[in-house]
């Protein structure tokens, strides 16, 4: 999640503390079992597994994930992503908008999770999702990763120059590649319009534009441009009845798909949104 896959050891241990607090105080499920190791021990364990390496530095040791370990670490992340997907979505929402009405946060979380539910096998119903979100927000407030501004009923990010703001952004980074894939797919559908693309054509367009994004911008997670991930998401959209495939093979949709698209814009940086929109326009004109 960090630039160049490298982190200051102290900062890394702080992030581990945040994850452990979320796992303990707002667990994904009652059966969730947290890690009994403290953050320093977790880092040491990862070193022994050789999935990270240490660089000694007078200003503080750096911990880095070697390039050759990136596919393995992506696999590790994807295996546990459902556990922290909801905190990550909330972190993305607030860190990229600075100050949001709490009701808007709840609405956006519900819309985004409706798209992620099948892909990540998320367990919550509508009411359960609201309760889980509130529990997570309480933990993030207690850890100063969120704050209540003066206006009642709003949520705000920490000050941009603070360490807490950096940590909130890092928390959101875990879900960013998935959200970017979703936004690219929805933006392409919106660009072409209902009833103009077949499923294979949409998969090909997503794959081709994702490859280009990976080369031009910082869309550099190993699995971001993989065609199979887009194919799976499009299949989930059809199963969830966000898309309807007619006998002639064309994909149709209505405002039920455009509403999550609007919500998805809230969780990405301006740079990511603009890059994806530009590529979607280019793909639509091709």
Where are the regions that the model predicts?
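Membrane-interfacial terminal anchoring regions of lipid-handling membrane enzymes
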Residues: 1-286
């Amino acid at each position: 999640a960090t630039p160049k896959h490298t982190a200051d050891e102290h900062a890394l241990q702080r992030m581990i503390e945040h994850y452990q607090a979320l796992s303990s105080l707002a667990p994904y499920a009652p059966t969730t079992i947290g890690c009994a190791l403290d953050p320093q021990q977790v880092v040491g364990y990862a070193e022994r597994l050789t999935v990270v390496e240490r660089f000694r530095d007078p200003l503080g040791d750096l911990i880095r994930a070697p390039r050759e370990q990136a596919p393995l670490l992506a696999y590790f992340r994807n295996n546990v992503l459902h556990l922290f997907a909801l905190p990550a979505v909330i972190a993305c929402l607030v860190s990229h908008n600075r100050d949001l009405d709490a009701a808007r946060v709840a609405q956006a979380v519900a819309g985004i999770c409706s798209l992620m539910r099948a892909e990540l096998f998320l367990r919550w119903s509508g009411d359960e999702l609201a309760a889980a979100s509130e529990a997570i927000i309480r933990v993030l407030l207690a850890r100063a990763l969120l704050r209540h501004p003066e206006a009642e009923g709003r949520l705000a990010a920490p000050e941009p120059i603070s360490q807490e703001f950096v940590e909130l952004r890092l928390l959101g980074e875990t879900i960013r590649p998935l959200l970017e894939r979703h936004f690219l797919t929805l933006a392409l559908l919106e660009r072409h319009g209902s009833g103009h693309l077949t499923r294979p054509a949409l998969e090909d367009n997503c794959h081709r534009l994702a490859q280009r994004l990976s080369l031009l911008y910082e869309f550099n997670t190993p699995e971001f441009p993989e065609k199979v991930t887009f194919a799976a998401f499009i299949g989930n959209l059809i199963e969830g009845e966000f898309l309807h495939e007619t006998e002639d093979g064309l994909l149709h949709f209505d405002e039920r798909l455009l509403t999550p698209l609007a919500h998805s814009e809230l969780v990405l940086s301006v740079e990511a949104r603009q890059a994806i929109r530009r590529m979607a326009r280019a793909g639509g004109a091709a």
